[in-house]
């Protein structure tokens, strides 16, 4: 697949911003990064690294690949021009060690010349604290071996991270005094209107009132996300049920994940309607986005309910998965492949419908909760 992608890039060109793509099958995972070759060239420059077995790799929209060794074909692939383009465009002098991210990247989200940002650092450090990784470093490994085995629900949790309760929590200084119920005593708590997805205008206003009240960090779960996926590949099962895409619309920190199997033949009609440009009740994304945005009005009063709903569907998906796998194989044996895939299609549709109903009900409830003012 990677070589075909490379051939297509060479033939037709790549004209977008730099991009990272993950190429995976049940046996291995490759990390593929690509850039354009310049305004006057049809082509592109790319490199791909195999993530070692038992490792977790992290990329969050900045180049991460460092050493490129085309001779190590078991673990590395690259376009034939990977070094030549860097020299021609003045990105690399050909003398110091070549680092792909340094040659072709423009720094991280903070403008620092690093091979990582806060998101990569946070996840890698959380998975392998024994490595004692430092944010002050110039480069972090593209992958680490976690200190303990990582489950699919661990990955879901990492994609929903807002750094709550850590030193990177953007709400940690937004505290108010609250009188305890049935007591004259007061307690200091995070303001219920504080949330990790505050707009730039809100952050600027708060910092104008009190300097450094909010220190902004790029979150793993960003509110402008259209959708996110956790892809689970199991080689001991038939491909149709062994491959599962756990998809979440909108903010990964606020939405449930819906199982879409490789054997799922079709999706609900609302999944086929784009809701990115305007509000549309017939677009699936708005079944979630409306409640998610309303919840941030008083996140302190809504987050427990929303997190409980996410946990409900996470548990439902994981608890029912073994039954779905077993039932698929049973139908496959008794009725054939088409009937088995129809079963998976129906399961995905039913699961999606249940999540959308829950989020629509929450959205209605939040409107009622805030009807007299936000």
State what each model feature region is.
Residues 2-16, 23-28, 35-39, 51-53:
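Active-site-adjacent structural elements in enzyme catalytic domains
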Residues 6, 17-19, 26-29, 44, ...:
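C-terminus-biased signal that marks the final domain/tail of proteins
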Residues 34-35, 61:
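Surface loops and adjacent helix of pleckstrin homology
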Residues 41-47:
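The feature captures the catalytic groove of carbohydrate-active enzymes
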